[in-house]
Amino acid sequence: MLDIQFIREHADVVKESQRKRGESVELVDEVLRSDEVRRSSLKEFEAARAQQKEIGKKVAAAPADEKAKLIAATKELSQKVSEYKAAADAAAEEYTTAMWKLSNIVEPEAPEGGEDDYVVVKKVGQIRDFAAEGFEPKDHLTLGRGVAGIDMERGVKVGGSRFYFLRGQVARMQIAMLTMAVDQAEEHGFTLAITPTLVRPEVMRGTGFLNSHADEIYRLREPDDQYLVGTSEVALAGMHENEILNLENGPLRYCGWSSCYRREAGAAGKDTSGIIRVHQFDKVEMFVYAKQEDSYKEHEHLLAMEQEMLGKVEVPYRIIDTAAGDLGSSAARKFDCEAWVPTQGRYRELTSTSNCTEYQARRLNIRERMEDGNTRAVSTLNGTLATTRWLVAILENHQQKDGSIEIPKAMRPYMGGKEVIEPTKWEA
């Protein structure tokens, strides 16, 4: 949610942000109109209520000949107060509905355009020349099957399309990768949290995921009425809902480990083979609560953390600055790290990090106490540190001619010192 005072004073900035996102500019005018109606309706109600109280005080002390008139006036005014109250409540509801539709204000530096209008910030790592090495690279699913590590067929049998089993050394590789990510996060001052994967509607709405991505989210209907999270960002944002934080000693940094669930409603025909786009996966997510003035520095820190982790798994990658039209409603700016996938001949997203400024905090009522005793909204940021999809890039970029997988050096201590995953026949 945005600051209404900012919208009143800088409507042109908010409209420009909406335009860059490809969203309704007229919504800003709707917010301002409903805000004016809300304030005037509330003023009428409060004036009538004050008059009602004043007359009520006079009734007890009034002479008998005036008391009847005052009582009649009180009854008449009571009806008006009820009408003004109903009008004020309706105006407040209309205002709130409009406000919650507005997306966060895009940072001026974010590129204009849509999904394909990102800007490449830099590329890191050398892309392998498999032709020079004398063999055609296999895709991650073929490799995973070859080491008895990825079983899509039985996953589909059990859970339906886009489900899978990770087994043996590939399952160990995922645990190793996620554990390595947690260790790195803790070294940088993050606190590990195993988070809920079911959240209340108010928390899901507060983080902004029910705006344009509601169809991507699994929902449990009544009597539960809860949502399955697609990232631990949701639970970590909701953890301090309705709280006043102390950020005088620096940002609060969390590292969430959870299973995640996504419907992939708009993914028909996309990535139907393998584990790039699935309904369930595991992820380590960074989440930060920071002072408003520190959010940009923290965003750079999260991106550096992601790069450090990508360096450990030794895959070529690039960083892109996501265009405004491809940002989620909560993000003011977002950077993606995309790894090279040899068999696809292109980069695929492995991580993203977003600065959500005060947008989520206002919706969830998360504030900090200032030196003067007043409170203000904090900034929230998030970034992926490792997730199941990383296995795709690791398997393909570290494959050997015989179908074995060389384990990245940094991961070997997490896999008992093992250096290579050898081809293995399925035992069952």
Curated annotation (Swiss-Prot):
PROSITE patterns: AA_TRNA_LIGASE_II. The keyword Transit peptide does not apply. ATP binds at residues 262-264, 278, 349-352. GO terms for molecular function: ATP binding; serine-tRNA ligase activity. L-serine binds at residues 231-233, 285, 384. Pfam families: Seryl_tRNA_N (PF02403), tRNA-synt_2b (PF00587). The keyword Cell cycle does not apply. GO terms for cellular component: cytoplasm. Its EC number is 6.1.1.11. This is Serine--tRNA ligase. Consists of two distinct domains, a catalytic core and a N-terminal extension that is involved in tRNA binding. It comes from Bifidobacterium adolescentis (strain ATCC 15703 / DSM 20083 / NCTC 11814 / E194a). Homodimer. The tRNA molecule binds across the dimer. The gene is serS. Signal peptide: none annotated.
